[in-house]
Amino acid sequence: MTKTVYVLNGPNLNLLGTREPQVYGSQTLADVEQLCTAACARHGLALVFRQSNHEGALVDWIHEASRLHAAGQLAGVVLNAAAYTHTSVALLDAVKGTGVPVVELHISNVHARESFRHHSYLAGAARAVMCGFGVQGYALAIDGLAQW
């Protein structure tokens, strides 16, 4: 049975490649999806790759992933909640309430940036937190999920 990895991207990540390239790099979200597709293929995993600027959509997708988790068909979720990392109790409750294995991911090193980015509501509920590896962090997170 092939397990699935969900890669969920939050607000403004659709602007990758043009938004603050000195912070986030020049690769686009389509480039990130290709990177994730290749990483999943190396491990024989299926990929669901999504982006939304809306908090509720991210919550719904975590709930969707939890159904695969309950059926033993989920490797895990890579969650780049972007700004919602620092504000969303709803995402925290979704992760805690479903028990899905989550890797919290940030392209930049959030701890080297503005102080408001240093706090994560999600970190305590995530299995792992990755930041500062650029978009390559997505592939590293998938590699980690494949080992669990």
Swiss-Prot record:
Origin superkingdom: Bacteria
Catalytic reaction(s) noted: 3-dehydroquinate = 3-dehydroshikimate + H2O
Q: Which GO terms describe its molecular function?
A: 3-dehydroquinate dehydratase activity
For this protein, the Enzyme Commission number is 4.2.1.10
Instruction: Note the Pfam families from the entry.
Output: DHquinase_II
The site feature described as Transition state stabilizer is recorded at 19
Sorted alphabetically, the Gene Ontology BP terms of this entry are: amino acid biosynthetic process; aromatic amino acid family biosynthetic process; chorismate biosynthetic process; quinate catabolic process
Annotated residues for binding of substrate: 80, 86, 93, 107-108, 117
Cited InterPro entries: DHquinase_II, DHquinase_II_CS, DHquinase_II_sf
| Pathway involvement of the protein, from the record | Metabolic intermediate biosynthesis; chorismate biosynthesis; chorismate from D-erythrose 4-phosphate and phosphoenolpyruvate: step 3/7
Alphabetic keyword roster = Amino-acid biosynthesis, Aromatic amino acid biosynthesis, Lyase
Q: Does the keyword Amino-acid biosynthesis apply?
A: yes
- Active site annotated at which positions? 24, 106
Purpose: Catalyzes a trans-dehydration via an enolate intermediate.
In terms of HAMAP family, this protein maps to:
AroQ
Give the similarity note.
Answer: Belongs to the type-II 3-dehydroquinase family.
What do we know about how this protein assembles, alone or with others? Answer: Homododecamer.
Question: What NCBIfam families does the database record attribute to this sequence?
Answer: aroQ, PRK05395.1-2, PRK05395.1-3, PRK05395.1-4
Tell me the protein's name.
3-dehydroquinate dehydratase
UniProt organism field: Acidovorax ebreus (strain TPSY) (Diaphorobacter sp. (strain TPSY))
Originating gene: aroQ
